[in-house]
């Protein structure tokens, strides 16, 4: 009897192992956690394995890229800024659902990162002060637009690297799609906003405030 039970358990374990090997696909939860870790650590080689950007609207990214080229922002400057924004990123997976037949999955995650609202507030104060100081300088001594942009970038990076900054936690549904038989994160605006500590929400609120003030 014991041998029969043992044989059944071994057989079941073998079948499960073969099934797992046959799929050759990491779960949606595994991909989500590994993708978030790659983003936090700014692992540029690993990011394409977990993130799918094919369905994203890249118009804004294109405009930012053109602006970066105009002021000659280096890859090092950009990497330093991104890493400062994601260095405190942490997460807790709440649940995961997969629908391989439909090619979709959803992982509910509690994301924690820096709260960008107070950081943006500090940045605007310092940027305004710098701009005013520049405008008061004599002709020929005023910094160029490129120099001012570099200064703003450094100011924001320094603010993000402060210790003791506030954090915010947001629960979001992280969507994934099957790409060549593997799950990949296809972030929507809510996910991006949570990853960036509410930066998109803060920007929209600021834009609305400026529009109301100008009306």
Predicted regions and their residues:
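Short beta-strand edge/turn micro-motifs at domain boundaries
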Residues: 127-147, 164-207
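Core segments of small alpha/beta cavity-forming domains
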Residues: 23-94, 118
């Amino acid at each position: 009897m014991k041998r029969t039970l043992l044989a059944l358990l071994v057989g079941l374990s073998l079948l499960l192992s073969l099934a797992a090997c046959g799929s050759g696909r990491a779960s949606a939860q595994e991909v989500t956690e590994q993708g978030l870790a790659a983003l936090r650590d700014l692992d540029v080689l690993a990011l394409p394995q977990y993130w799918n950007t094919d369905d994203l609207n890249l118009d804004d990214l294109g405009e930012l890229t053109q602006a970066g080229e105009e002021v000659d922002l280096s890859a090092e400057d950009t990497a330093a800024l991104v890493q400062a924004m994601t260095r405190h990123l942490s997460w807790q997976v709440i649940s995961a659902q997969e629908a391989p037949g439909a090619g979709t999955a959803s992982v509910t995650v509690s994301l924690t990162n820096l709260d960008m609202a107070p950081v943006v507030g500090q940045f605007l104060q310092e940027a305004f002060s710098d701009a005013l100081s520049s405008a008061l300088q004599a002709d020929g001594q005023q910094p160029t637009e490129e120099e001012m942009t570099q200064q703003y970038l450094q100011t924001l990076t320094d603010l993000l690297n402060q210790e003791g900054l506030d954090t915010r936690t947001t629960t979001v549904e992280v969507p994934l799609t099957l790409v060549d038989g593997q799950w990949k994160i296809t972030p929507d605006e809510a996910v991006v906003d949570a990853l960036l500590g509410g930066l998109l929400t803060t920007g929209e609120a600021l834009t609305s405030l400026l529009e109301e003030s100008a009306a």
